[in-house]
Amino acid sequence: MHELSLCQSAVEIIQQQAEQHGVARVTGVWLEIGALSCVEERAVRFSFDIACQGTLAQGCELHIDYRPAQAWCWDCSQVVEILRHDAQCPHCHGDRLRVDTGDSLKVKSIEVE
C-alpha cells in the first residue's frame, strides 16, 4: 500500500508549511490525484488520517480532486487527455503516447486557523 508513504510525504509538507507560517491548526487539505497515479481514494483517505495523527493537520477535512493525465501523441503531434495507461490518442487512434502529467499526488492547498 504505497498510499501510506505518499500521504506521509504530503503531511510532512503540510506540517512544514504550517510551522513556517505560525499556524495553530490545519482545518482542510486539498489533494490533486492524477488519473495514472495508481492510488485508490479509500486507501488515500485511510492513510491520510493515519499520517495526520499527532500533527497540526489531525482531524482536518480532506478534499480530493482527480485530474486526467496529459500525454503527447508521437503519431499526430497533439497533446491529449487520457485516463488509462493503455489509452489511444482520441485524434488519430495511435498508441504511441508519452505521458507528461497525471501520474502524481500533489498538495494543492491547505486551509488553516
UniProtKB/Swiss-Prot annotation:
An MF annotation (GO) of this entry: zinc ion binding
Protein residues bound to Zn(2+): C73, C76, C89, C92
Keyword Calcium: no
Any Gene Ontology biological process: protein maturation
Record flagged with keyword Metal-binding: yes
Residues at which Ni(2+) binds: H2, E3
Gene3D superfamilies associated with the record: 3.30.2320.80
Superkingdom of origin organism: Bacteria
Matches recorded under PROSITE patterns: HYPA
Entry keywords, A to Z: Metal-binding, Nickel, Zinc
Protein family according to the UniProt entry: Belongs to the HypA/HybF family. HybF subfamily.
NCBIfam families membership: hypA, PRK03681.1, PRK12380.1
Purpose: Involved in the maturation of [NiFe] hydrogenases. Required for nickel insertion into the metal center of the hydrogenase.
Protein name stated in the entry: Hydrogenase maturation factor HybF
Source organism of this protein record: Salmonella typhimurium (strain LT2 / SGSC1412 / ATCC 700720)
